[in-house]
């Protein structure tokens, strides 16, 4: 499964290389490789395949949750599709509250202690996910799992910020899968 997802990412040119001018990742790290999972939303067949694989992954790994939460902004379309496929309510989490209106960081309806899975497009070192997990927990949600389509998987997870938050990161494919199909 993971190698097929990797092939799909390569086919739609989500995997890009730039050896002269490195990409700056969300983590601040520089990389000659950039995986742009946001492109998936524009490719219907590939998107449908990948989202179906996500649903199968949840079943095979017995992930238990009551709500699907999309992280602003890249996680929102995938959370919406997954939520629809598995018939579970959806939320979305902002990086920070809007500062006007109801000044909410989390949109959607939920109850304290409900279990939520955070959906994002990808993760490098997981640092940007901390904001979402902390906001969800502060709101009373139980968060122990994060699901991403692509995970670089090049850092020691246990010593990472997410490892210290006691959350598990799940992915459909990693950098090793991309390399194995190139």
Can you annotate each of these PLM segments?
Residues 63-72, 147-148:
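Short glycine-rich phosphate-binding loop at a beta-alpha junction
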Residues 78-117, 125-130:
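Short, glycine/charge-rich flexible loops or terminal/linker lids adjacent to PRPP-binding catalytic cores
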Residues 1-63:
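Active-site-facing substrate-recognition patch
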Residues 66, 114, 144:
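Conserved acidic residues
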Residues 2-12, 134-182:
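PRPP-dependent phosphoribosyltransferase catalytic core
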Residues 28, 68, 90:
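Conserved hydrophobic/aromatic pocket- or pore-lining residues that grip, position, or stack substrates
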Residues 56, 80, 84, 134, ...:
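Short, well-ordered alpha-helices that flank and scaffold nucleotide-derived cofactor binding pockets
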């Amino acid at each position: 499964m993971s190698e097929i997802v990797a092939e799909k990412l390569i086919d739609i040119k989500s995997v890009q290389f730039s050896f002269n001018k490195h990409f700056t990742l969300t983590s601040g790290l520089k990389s000659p490789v950039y995986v742009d999972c946001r492109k998936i939303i524009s490719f219907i067949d590939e998107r449908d395949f990948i989202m179906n694989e996500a649903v199968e992954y949840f079943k095979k790994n017995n992930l238990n949750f009551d709500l699907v939460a999309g992280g602003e902004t890249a996680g929102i379309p995938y959370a919406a599709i997954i939520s629809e496929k598995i018939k579970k309510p959806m939320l979305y989490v902002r990086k920070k509250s809007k500062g006007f209106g109801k000044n909410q960081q989390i949109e959607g309806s939920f109850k304290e202690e409900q279990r939520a899975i955070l959906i994002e497009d990808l993760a490098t070192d997981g640092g940007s996910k901390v904001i979402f997990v902390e906001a969800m927990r502060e709101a009373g949600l139980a968060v122990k799992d994060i699901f991403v389509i692509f995970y670089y998987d090049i850092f020691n997870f246990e010593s990472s910020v997410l490892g210290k938050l006691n959350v598990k990161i799940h992915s459909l494919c990693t950098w090793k899968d991309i390399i194995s199909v190139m």
